[in-house]
Each structure stands twice: as structure tokens, then as C-alpha cells.
UniProtKB/Swiss-Prot annotation:
BP terms from Gene Ontology: isopentenyl diphosphate biosynthetic process, methylerythritol 4-phosphate pathway; terpenoid biosynthetic process
Protein name: 2-C-methyl-D-erythritol 2,4-cyclodiphosphate synthase
Disulphide bond pairs: none
Lineage of source species: Bacteria, Pseudomonadati, Spirochaetota, Spirochaetia, Leptospirales
Record Pfam families: YgbB (PF02542)
Subunit structure: Homotrimer.
Length: 161
């Protein structure tokens, strides 16, 4: 049996040299930072939501509510690990992921290899089962005005026999 999951996450983008920009589990050299209750890693959040969606287990807000002060600035790797544990408990394995980052800045292409390698390590997936792409909104809307960035992620899970 296979299950497909989709995840999406958006965060406000700001210039902030005192907060790191975290994407796909790596710290990126940038004048930009994402605003959020957690470390605001939009890639790991979208992957985590996709896993939960494929398993029909809700979303990360149910497990890690932004109203819980103890979760302030939580490392998104902790969120992902919890979702992977739930996946294993349900006897599923991750087959592949496909992520698209949407926004004008920061440019993702120079970061793609590092992000993909990080995801490979975090997810225990071969590199050829991980796709990280980027696109813009052609300067339209809030993302086009560089007010934020987002990520869409699709995943495939396979039930262990």
C-alpha cells in the first residue's frame, strides 16, 4: 500500500542578522531570517506536514502548537524526527520527496546541494529520491514583494510488508 502526502508552509521574511536562516536543516549565510515560533524551517515543516497528511494524523500544529511557550525557537529537526517516528509506528517507509521553495530571495540554487544532502541524512533517503526545486512568483503578491517565502512538498510512503 502506498500513501501520498502534501505539505505546505509559509513564513514571513525579514532582514535580521541576529537570527539564522534555516532551510532544510542547514544554516544559510544570509541577511534574511524567517519569522516564526520555531526556527521557521519551511522545508522541514512542509515535509513534516506531508508525512502527517499521508498518515491521516493531522498537522504539525497539533503536535507542536505555537501557543506552547516551551516550544519557542524549537529546532525543526525535532519536529521532523517526531513525524518520522509516527511514520515508523504505522509501519511506513519514505520512498521519495519533492519540495518546491517559492520566493524571490534568498536564491535557493546555490544552497540546493547542501539542502539535499542534509535532507538525505535526516530522512535516511538516497540523494536520487530527494528533489529540491525553487521558483518565484514573478514579483507578484506578498512573496513577490519579498515579504515571505514558502515551500510545497509531496511525499510517497510505502507500507512495510
Amino acid at each position: 500500500m502506498y500513501r501520498i502526502g502534501n505539505g505546505i508552509d509559509f513564513h514571513k521574511l525579514e532582514i535580521n542578522l541576529n537570527r539564522p536562516l534555516i532551510l532544510g536543516g542547514i544554516e544559510c549565510e544570509s541577511e534574511f531570517a524567517l519569522v516564526g515560533h520555531s526556527d521557521a524551517d519551511i522545508i522541514l515543516h512542509a515535509i513534516s506536514d506531508a508525512i502527517l497528511g499521508a498518515l491521516a494524523l493531522g498537522d504539525i500544529g497539533q503536535y507542536f502548537p505555537d501557543t506552547d511557550p516551551s516550544l519557542k525557537n524549537i529546532d525543526s529537526k525535532i519536529i521532523l524526527v517526531k513525524c518520522l517516528e509516527l511514520m515508523k509506528e504505522k509501519n511506513f517507509d519514505l520512498v521519495n520527496i519533492d519540495c518546491t521553495v517559492i520566493g524571490e530571495r534568498p536564491k535557493i540554487t546555490p544552497l540546493k546541494d547542501r539542502i539535499t544532502k542534509s535532507l538525505s541524512n535526516l530522512l535516511n533517503l538516497p540523494l536520487d529520491c530527494i528533489s529540491v526545486k525553487a521558483t518565484t512568483t514573478e514579483k507578484m503578491g506578498a512573496l513577490g514583494r519579498q515579504e515571505g517565502i514558502g515551500t510545497f512538498c509531496s511525499i510517497l510512503l510505502e507500507k512495510r510488508s
